[in-house]
C-alpha cells in the first residue's frame, strides 16, 4: 500500500476537523491540510499555495473542484470558506497562470472539457478540430423583436426596435406611394407609406426584419392610413426610443408560417405600388398542371347548372368531349402565356373575372343564378 495513501486515510479517519488539500500546478502535486472550522483568510491561503509550489514570482489564479465536478474560482474569503466547508473529504485545488485562466477555463463543465482534451491527445485516430472557447458577452442587449404574432395577420409583421439610449439612428427612410387593396368592388389604389432606403450599418438593417418596399401600416398602434408623409415621420421620431412598426413585407417568403402553410412571394412592385396576394389565384397556380389538360378520365372544365345547356353542333368525326378538351387546352395556354409576361398575376385575375360564356361558347340561359363553377 502506498505510504501517502495510507497517511491520508489515517488523517481522514482520526482527525475529522482537518481537511486534506491536494493542489495541482502543471504536472506538480502538493498535499497539505487545513482546519475545517478555522480555515483562515484567503490571503494566507494564497501565500501558502505559492510558497508550497515555489511560484512566488508568478501571477496565478486558484480554483477548486466542487462536488458537481465544476471548476470554481477561489479569490476571496467567502468562496474560500465555501470551498473548505464543501470538501468531502478531499479539497482539490487547481493553480493556473492568469493568462491561461482568462481564456475561459473556469466555469461549469470545465473539468469534463479538460478530460476530453487529454483523451484527444492520447487518441491515435484522426485529429478533430480544435475547440473554440467563447467568453461571456460583455455588452449583450436585444436589438429587435417580433411581437404580437398571434394578433396580426399572417401577411403582416409587427417589429419592435430597441435603441437603449444609443446615438445610432433608426436607419431607414420612408416615402409615400400607392398601395393596392382588394375590396368587394374590386382592386383599388389607396395612398400608402413605404420604406424607400436602408442605411448600411443602421439599427433597422442590423435587425433583418425590415426591408425596402415594405409597407408601413401602423406606428405604435396608430394606423398611418389617411396621414401624410410628414405626419408619419413625426410619429416615428417621437417614438424612436421604443418604436413599434407594423409592416406588410414585400417579400412574403420570409414571413412567419403558421399551420404548416407556406406563404408565396408577392415580390417588390415595379411601378411603386404595393404587391398583394389574392387567395384564389395562387391556389389555382399551385394545383394546375399542364398534363391534366389532356386527361381522359376527368373533364378539365366542369360546368354545374340547374338547366341543361344546349349542346353546340359538333363537326363530323369529332369525339364527345372534344370541346371541353379544346377549351381546357386553350385556357392552359393562356395561363402559361400570362405567367410568362410581366404582371401575369393581374392579367390572370382579369381573365378569370371575364364572362365565361364568351370563352366557353355557352348559350345564354345555360348558367345557374350564381354563375358557373370552373374547376381546373
Swiss-Prot record:
The UniProt annotation puts the region (Disordered) at 356-376
| Start and end residues of each stretch annotated as Interaction with PARD3 and CDC42 | 127-254
Under Gene3D superfamilies, the record lists: 2.30.42.10, Phosphatidylinositol 3-kinase Catalytic Subunit, Chain A, domain 1
Q: Where in the cell is it found?
A: Cytoplasm; Cell membrane; Cell junction, Tight junction
Domain (Pseudo-CRIB): residue spans on this chain: 134-151
InterPro entries in the record: PAR6_homolog, PB1-like, PB1_dom, PB1_Par6, PDZ, PDZ_sf
Q: Tell me the SUPFAM superfamilies matching this sequence.
A: CAD & PB1 domains, PDZ domain-like
| Summary of the tissues where the protein is detected | Widely expressed, with a higher expression in fetal and adult kidney.
Supply the alphabetized keyword list: Cell cycle, Cell division, Cell junction, Cell membrane, Cytoplasm, Membrane, Tight junction
Q: Which family does it belong to?
A: Belongs to the PAR6 family.
Domain comment from the record reads as follows: The pseudo-CRIB domain together with the PDZ domain is required for the interaction with Rho small GTPases.
PANTHER family to which the protein is assigned, alphabetical: PAR-6-RELATED (PTHR14102), PARTITIONING DEFECTIVE 6 HOMOLOG GAMMA (PTHR14102:SF3)
Assembly and binders? Interacts with PARD3. Interacts with GTP-bound forms of CDC42, RHOQ/TC10 and RAC1. Interacts with the N-terminal part of PRKCI and PRKCZ.
What is the protein's known function? Adapter protein involved in asymmetrical cell division and cell polarization processes. May play a role in the formation of epithelial tight junctions. The PARD6-PARD3 complex links GTP-bound Rho small GTPases to atypical protein kinase C proteins.
| Official protein name in the record | Partitioning defective 6 homolog gamma
- Origin organism is Homo sapiens
Amino acid at each position: 500500500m502506498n505510504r501517502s495513501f495510507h497517511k491520508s486515510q489515517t488523517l481522514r479517519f482520526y482527525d475529522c476537523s482537518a481537511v486534506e488539500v491536494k493542489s495541482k500546478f502543471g504536472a506538480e502535486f502538493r498535499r497539505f491540510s487545513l482546519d475545517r472550522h478555522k480555515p483562515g483568510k484567503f490571503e494566507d491561503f494564497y501565500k501558502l499555495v505559492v510558497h508550497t509550489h515555489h511560484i512566488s514570482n508568478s501571477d496565478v489564479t486558484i480554483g477548486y473542484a466542487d462536488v458537481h465536478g465544476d471548476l470554481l474560482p477561489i479569490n476571496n474569503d467567502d468562496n474560500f470558506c465555501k470551498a473548505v466547508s464543501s470538501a468531502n473529504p478531499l479539497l482539490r485545488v487547481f493553480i493556473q497562470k492568469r493568462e491561461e485562466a482568462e481564456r475561459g477555463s473556469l466555469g461549469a463543465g470545465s473539468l469534463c472539457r479538460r478530460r476530453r482534451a487529454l483523451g484527444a491527445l492520447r487518441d491515435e485516430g484522426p485529429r478533430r478540430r480544435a475547440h473554440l472557447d467563447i467568453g461571456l458577452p460583455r455588452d449583450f442587449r436585444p436589438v429587435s423583436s417580433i411581437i404580437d404574432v398571434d394578433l396580426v395577420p399572417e401577411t403582416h409583421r409587427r417589429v419592435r426596435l430597441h435603441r437603449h439610449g444609443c446615438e445610432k439612428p433608426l436607419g431607414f427612410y420612408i416615402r409615400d406611394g400607392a398601395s393596392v387593396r382588394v375590396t368587394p368592388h374590386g382592386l383599388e389604389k389607396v395612398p400608402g407609406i413605404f420604406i424607400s432606403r436602408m442605411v448600411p450599418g443602421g439599427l433597422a438593417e442590423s435587425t433583418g426584419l425590415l426591408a425596402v418596399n415594405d409597407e408601413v401600416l401602423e406606428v405604435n398602434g396608430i394606423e398611418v392610413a389617411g396621414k401624410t408623409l410628414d405626419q408619419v415621420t413625426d410619429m416615428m421620431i417621437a417614438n424612436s426610443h421604443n418604436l413599434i412598426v407594423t409592416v406588410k413585407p414585400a417579400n412574403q417568403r420570409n414571413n412567419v408560417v403558421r399551420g404548416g402553410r407556406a406563404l408565396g412571394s408577392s415580390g417588390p412592385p415595379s411601378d411603386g405600388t404595393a404587391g398583394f396576394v389574392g387567395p384564389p389565384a395562387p391556389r389555382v397556380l399551385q394545383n394546375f398542371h399542364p398534363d391534366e389538360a389532356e386527361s381522359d378520365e376527368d373533364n378539365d372544365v366542369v360546368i354545374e347548372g340547374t338547366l341543361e345547356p344546349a349542346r353546340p353542333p359538333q363537326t363530323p368525326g369529332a369525339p364527345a368531349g372534344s370541346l371541353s378538351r379544346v377549351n381546357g387546352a386553350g385556357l392552359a395556354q393562356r395561363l402559361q402565356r400570362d405567367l410568362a409576361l410581366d404582371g401575369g398575376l393581374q392579367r390572370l385575375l382579369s381573365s378569370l373575372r371575364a364572362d365565361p360564356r364568351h370563352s366557353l361558347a355557352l348559350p345564354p340561359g345555360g348558367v345557374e343564378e350564381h354563375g358557373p363553377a370552373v374547376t381546373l
